Design a protein with these regions (language model features):
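Intrinsically disordered, low-complexity polar regions and short flexible loop motifs
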Residues: 3-243
Length: 243
């Protein structure tokens, strides 16, 4: 009947936004979690340093994202829950990070989900790789990222915990990234960013600073590194320490 047809049309036109979730919480208590969208299990046994693919999420209405232990049976067991209202047609990057435990971590920066609302699923120019860089290491200071391989210089200036850069639109090549202190004088670590070798021509990706500079003060959690989340999701790709 016509009534039924109208219902179907309403169902088809539900507005959506695109969302990728990245697990960057280095707290051992959250090494694997369940993620619920409203009360539905979205990601089962979501492991540290993995990402979802981009998924459709409801837009224009409040919905909840809940993080629960990997053994959870329902969202009622959530450790934390957040409410979002997304803009139709927009693309969002969500990064889960921080500390859930009450002891064993210094600093014990509170768990949060950081949101970047202008995400990309591909590069804006097919010859480039678009990188979004995010500082998600709880015990790392404010840093600069300096490219020394092709001489691009300071590509990130004074990034503090929780910060996102805007997208860096880079010619797809193999780069060398130095993590320096805010003065730019002290180099903490140097990484290869082999965008060409990784086959990222025309792709976008999120680079997260992850883990602990001082694991001994953080329950011997995973050591600091730069990790790449690809649009297809899956395990984050560790950028190798430069030789």
């Amino acid at each position: 009947s016509s009534c039924k047809e109208e219902e179907e049309e309403v169902t088809q036109s539900n507005p959506t936004a695109r969302v990728q979730v990245i697990h960057n919480c280095a707290d051992l208590a959250a090494s694997s979690v369940d993620v619920y969208l409203n009360n539905n299990l979205l990601i089962d046994n979501f492991n540290f340093r993995t990402a979802s693919s981009f998924i459709d999420a409801p837009a224009g209405e409040d919905f909840s994202v809940s993080i629960a232990p990997s053994s959870s049976m329902s969202s009622a067991e959530a450790l934390v829950s957040y409410t979002y209202n997304l803009v139709e047609g927009e693309t969002y990057i969500l990064v889960a990070e921080g500390i859930i435990s009450t002891t064993g971590y210094s600093p014990a920066t509170a768990f949060s989900i950081e949101v970047y609302p202008m995400g990309r699923e591909a590069a804006s120019n097919e010859g480039n790789t678009d990188l979004l860089i995010h500082h998600g290491s709880t015990d790392a200071p404010t840093v600069d990222v300096v490219e020394t391989g092709v001489g691009a210089g300071t590509i990130v200036d004074d990034a503090s915990y929780g910060d996102f850069t805007s997208y860096l639109e880079l010619s797809t090549a193999d780069y060398t990234l130095e993590i320096r202190d805010a003065s730019g004088q002290v180099t903490y670590a140097t990484y290869s960013a082999p965008l060409l070798t990784l086959g990222l021509t025309g792709a976008s990706a999120v680079v997260v600073a992850s883990g602990f500079l001082d694991p001994s003060s953080n329950s011997n959690g995973e050591f600091f590194g730069l990790f790449v989340a690809l649009p297809a999701g899956g395990d984050l790709v560790a950028l190798p320490v430069a030789k």
